[in-house]
């Protein structure tokens, strides 16, 4: 959007930005504009170049060519410190906090004294509707609260250009609405917001302007209301995409059968029985999951879902109750023994807990099973394993020794799934598998999960995206304040019912809810 002498220049004007890594072109002469008081949404598939472009604007990476202007003034040799001085702040998709510092120390870190105003910080927190304990260590926060701390760091720096990379990926609907209210207040003050998201309804709700990146270029750009949802999706993934895995992919994905057999699956015996289990953040939880079943676990942030998953995996202590895996009592087992028995956990935060970002791809996939192979590496075996999962999961990478951190978010998530599958699970606990993943990669991951379940693996599927819980799960348990507030199956499995139960509204939801809840109670009594 060019400006004239009568109109003020754009807040941010990017012209002809290009970038290569090791001879591979990742940005091709990008033009991008942000006006004061505007939300400019940026979409694109994983690897489209969104993060690279934003890192250049934030001074993290230098461009190979092109210019960046703020208020019409060219910015040369931009660095993160200089970007902060100019009012540019990038809130990353994966929170980058100091785990051993308090929330307050993280928010005020490296702020000049004249900006380190605790009263202002308290006012901002109140306006966001946040109830963060400023004294606790940031490492103790869940991902949603860590994201809010990152946003607070930007707001405390009086940012005029706020880059939000998937800011709502781990937020509840209520937290998302509060964030949007705060963004709208900032817009009235002339702040411009670059909003990176894969959630099209949010973009429709918030963004004035939308740009779609594909293969390092701009495939579509204009006023949001000028484009239909289908047009935007087509710009992201123009090729007609088959939603089913090919027979070849299914063959490559076939898991070893020593832990799962047709006879065992047909016996209808539960793979896992959780009996009146209590631990940090939850109490008196009972349920069963059978071979080939996908059990959805829904609830708002803080409901205790991740705490329950980590306790089942042995990362947190049990304070009461029992866990049986195929009639073997694993309640007192260490994590390594649970893993060896067939209980595998895909964590919520792939970068902090799931993958070794600076290690090679092949080593990451092999890492869960290395304890069974001794201390020596097996390059040929690692290469063969990675190649199998590359074909099965369509993981895109350049070479085997490539560090994980160089992959896009969707490919990192597929690599984490490969790592979990190589451990040969009986029960796979999947926590937020599509957080920060684009539309195309989400479809891939859904099909992968269904294919895994079809091989008689029991799956516990945890997600804050209630629509995908309904889409993926055979049954749904809803948690509220650490307890099961409802069990749903059949026609009772819908977003509205789950939302009511997630907020503790114990209204009668019909016979499917009643029968399913009674079933959950019976499962606890059967241990």
UniProtKB/Swiss-Prot annotation:
Residues 12-240, 266-506 form the ABC transporter domain. SUPFAM superfamilies: P-loop containing nucleoside triphosphate hydrolases. Its main location: membrane. It is found in: Cell inner membrane. One of its GO terms (cellular component) is plasma membrane. It catalyses: ATP + H2O + (2R,4S)-2-methyl-2,3,3,4-tetrahydroxytetrahydrofuran-[AI-2-binding protein]Side 1 = ADP + phosphate + (2R,4S)-2-methyl-2,3,3,4-tetrahydroxytetrahydrofuranSide 2 + [AI-2-binding protein]Side 1. Its EC number is 7.6.2.13. GO terms for molecular function: ATP binding; ATP hydrolysis activity. It is a peripheral membrane protein. Keywords: ATP-binding, Cell inner membrane, Cell membrane, Membrane, Nucleotide-binding, Repeat, Translocase, Transport. Pfam families: ABC_tran. The complex is composed of two ATP-binding proteins (LsrA), two transmembrane proteins (LsrC and LsrD) and a solute-binding protein (LsrB). PANTHER family: AUTOINDUCER 2 IMPORT ATP-BINDING PROTEIN LSRA, CARBOHYDRATE TRANSPORT ATP-BINDING PROTEIN MG119-RELATED. Part of the ABC transporter complex LsrABCD involved in autoinducer 2 (AI-2) import. Responsible for energy coupling to the transport system. This is Autoinducer 2 import ATP-binding protein LsrA. It comes from Yersinia enterocolitica serotype O:8 / biotype 1B (strain NCTC 13174 / 8081). The lineage of its organism: Bacteria, Pseudomonadati, Pseudomonadota, Gammaproteobacteria, Enterobacterales. The gene is lsrA.
């Amino acid at each position: 959007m060019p400006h004239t002498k009568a109109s003020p220049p754009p807040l941010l004007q990017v012209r002809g930005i290009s970038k290569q890594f090791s001879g591979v072109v990742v940005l091709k002469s990008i033009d991008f504009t942000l006006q004061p008081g505007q939300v400019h949404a940026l979409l694109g598939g994983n690897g489209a170049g969104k993060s690279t472009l934003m890192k250049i604007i934030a001074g993290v990476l230098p461009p190979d060519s092109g210019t960046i202007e703020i208020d019409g003034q060219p910015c040369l040799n931009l660095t993160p410190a200089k970007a902060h001085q100019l009012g540019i702040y990038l809130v990353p998709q994966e929170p980058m906090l100091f785990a051993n510092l308090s929330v307050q120390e993280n928010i005020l870190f490296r702020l000049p004294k004249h900006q380190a105003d605790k009263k202002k910080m308290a006012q901002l927190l109140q306006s966001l509707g946040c109830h963060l304990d400023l004294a606790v260590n940031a490492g103790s926060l869940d991902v949603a609260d860590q994201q809010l701390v990152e946003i607070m760091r930007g707001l405390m720096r009086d940012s005029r250009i706020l880059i939000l990379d998937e800011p709502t990926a781990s937020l509840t609907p209520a937290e998302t609405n509060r964030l949007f209210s705060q963004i709208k207040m900032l817009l009235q003050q002339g702040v411009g917001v670059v909003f990176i998201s894969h959630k099209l309804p949010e973009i429709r709700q918030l963004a004035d302007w939308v740009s779609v990146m594909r293969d390092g270029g701009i495939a579509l750009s204009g006023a949001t209301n000028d484009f239909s949802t289908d047009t935007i999706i087509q710009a992201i993934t123009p090729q007609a995409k088959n939603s089913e895995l090919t027979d070849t992919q299914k063959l490559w994905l076939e898991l070893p059968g020593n832990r799962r057999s047709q006879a065992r699956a047909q016996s209808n015996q539960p793979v896992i029985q959780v009996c009146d289990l209590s631990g940090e953040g939850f109490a008196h939880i009972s349920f069963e999951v059978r071979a080939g079943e996908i059990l959805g676990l829904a609830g708002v942030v803080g409901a205790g879902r991740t705490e329950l998953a980590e306790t089942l995996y042995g990362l947190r202590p049990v304070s009461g109750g029992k866990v049986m895996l195929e009639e073997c009592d694993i309640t007192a087992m260490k994590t390594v023994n649970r893993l060896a028995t067939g209980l595998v956990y895909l964590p919520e935060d792939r970068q902090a807990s799931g993958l070794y970002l600076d290690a090679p791809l092949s080593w990451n996939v092999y890492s869960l099973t290395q304890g069974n192979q001794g201390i020596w590496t097996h390059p040929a075996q690692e290469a063969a394993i990675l190649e199998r999962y590359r074909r099965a999961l369509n993981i895109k990478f350049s070479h085997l020794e490539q560090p994980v951190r160089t992959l896009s978010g969707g490919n990192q998530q597929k690599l984490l799934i490969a790592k979990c599958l190589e451990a040969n699970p009986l029960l796979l606990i999947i926590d937020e598998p599509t957080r920060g993943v684009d539309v195309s990669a989400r479809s891939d991951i859904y099909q992968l999960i269904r294919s895994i379940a079809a091989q008689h693996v029991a799956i516990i599927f945890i997600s804050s995206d209630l629509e995908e819980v309904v889409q993926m799960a055979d049954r749904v348990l809803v948690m509220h304040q650490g307890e099961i507030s409802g069990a749903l199956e059949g026609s009772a499995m819908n977003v509205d019912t789950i939302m009511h139960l997630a907020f503790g509204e114990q209204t009668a939801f019909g016979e499917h809810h009643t029968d399913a809840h009674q079933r959950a109670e019976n499962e606890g009594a059967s241990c």
